[in-house]
Amino acid sequence: MEDLVVELGERSYPIIIKKGLINEVNLEIQKVFKGKKIFILTDKNVGSHYGDRIKSCLIKSGYDVKLMELEPGEETKAFSTLPLIYNELLDFKITRSDLIITLGGGVIGDLGGFAASTFLRGVDFVQIPTSLLAQVDSSVGGKVAVDLERGKNLVGSFYHPKLVLIDPNVLETLSERFFRDGMAEVIKYGCIKDKEFFYFLKSLKNKEEVMNNIEKIIHKCCFIKKCVVENDEKDTGERMLLNFGHTLGHAIETYYNFKKFTHGEAVAIGMYEISKIAENKGLTDQGVSEEIREILVQYNLPYEVEIDDSSEVLDTIALDKKNIDNVLKVVLLRNIGESYLEKTNVEFFS
């Protein structure tokens, strides 16, 4: 599979997608890092599969390596986790000439990337995403953040990695639920940018067929995202389209205190619900929400939810970063593969 490059001038970086890459991390790191110390941040689940393997191969290449394992789950991506990471970095005497590796899913990538961006005003880092969601979405584009009690990603920055290493083989150790979680983001790309890709995903009959095409799928998603990021790095226009389903999805995650739905499951619900609302308002072609519902059902993803206190959800939506001066930009579809921004307000969802 051809390597991709996110073209951002001096901050450009490659995305390498290759089966078996997890066993060649040291070779790729040597191409971008000439220092001595490497700090690996992971969680206990991922660490049990790949932590010692990667640490050992880096040590054999002459690096001084420290591995830190955190508890898995969204609760770890909290502001309060940062001092724990900073203290480990200080104990290891990491300097700005050293390297941080984030080995894990979106939580570790976001959390570790934000720690890298803020420690000593910035330490280089490399993303090694191990979940499908992180491989197709969160590892690319330089958005790093932590959560606050009142919402997701409320403290963050734009800080790009030096390199993204994607090994589709690591998905074999991913649970079925989190594989489906990632497929929600895959489906999103078809919804917003590529009708042909959407129907290709619909044509796949089962997980075996998906896995037989997984490199192609990951490559397509990363290609779409890298093109969008190159055109709108700081999320002021086109890049907002990548948030299709996320405004409502983030609110649903927060409403259930990040315990009932995974990120992808919440986004799946958000994509269907906002399309249904938009159809009723004449802003989306009729039948689009049904197409989305069908593909979500096909991939065993939820598409609707009962909310007892809608005011709480609306309060969370009001905190969305796309809500500026009480003008909320929501991402809608005209049709499958054709997305746009609609200026409205929080009442759009009521």
From Swiss-Prot:
Co-factor binding comment: Binds 1 divalent metal cation per subunit. Can use either Co(2+) or Zn(2+).
UniProt cross-references to InterPro entries, sorted A to Z: Dehydroquinate_synthase (IPR050071), DHQ_synth_AroB (IPR016037), DHQ_synth_fam (IPR030963), DHQS/DOIS_N (IPR030960), DHQS_C (IPR056179)
Reactions it catalyzes: 7-phospho-2-dehydro-3-deoxy-D-arabino-heptonate = 3-dehydroquinate + phosphate
GO molecular function: 3-dehydroquinate synthase activity; metal ion binding; nucleotide binding
Alphabetic keyword roster: Amino-acid biosynthesis, Aromatic amino acid biosynthesis, Cobalt, Cytoplasm, Lyase, Metal-binding, NAD, Nucleotide-binding, Zinc
Pathway(s) it belongs to: Metabolic intermediate biosynthesis; chorismate biosynthesis; chorismate from D-erythrose 4-phosphate and phosphoenolpyruvate: step 2/7
CDD domains: DHQS
EC number: 4.2.3.4
Record: residues binding Zn(2+): E185, H246, H263
Pfam families per UniProt: DHQ_synthase (PF01761), DHQS_C (PF24621)
Superkingdom to which the source organism belongs: Bacteria
Binding site for NAD(+): G106, V107, I108, G109, D110, T130, S131, K143, K152
Cofactor(s) the protein requires to work: Co(2+); Zn(2+); NAD(+)
UniProt GO cellular component terms: cytoplasm
Keyword Transmembrane helix found: no
PANTHER family: 3-DEHYDROQUINATE SYNTHASE, 3-DEHYDROQUINATE SYNTHASE, CHLOROPLASTIC
NCBIfam families given in the database record: aroB
Family statement: Belongs to the sugar phosphate cyclases superfamily. Dehydroquinate synthase family.
General function of this protein: Catalyzes the conversion of 3-deoxy-D-arabino-heptulosonate 7-phosphate (DAHP) to dehydroquinate (DHQ).
UniProt-recorded name of the protein: 3-dehydroquinate synthase
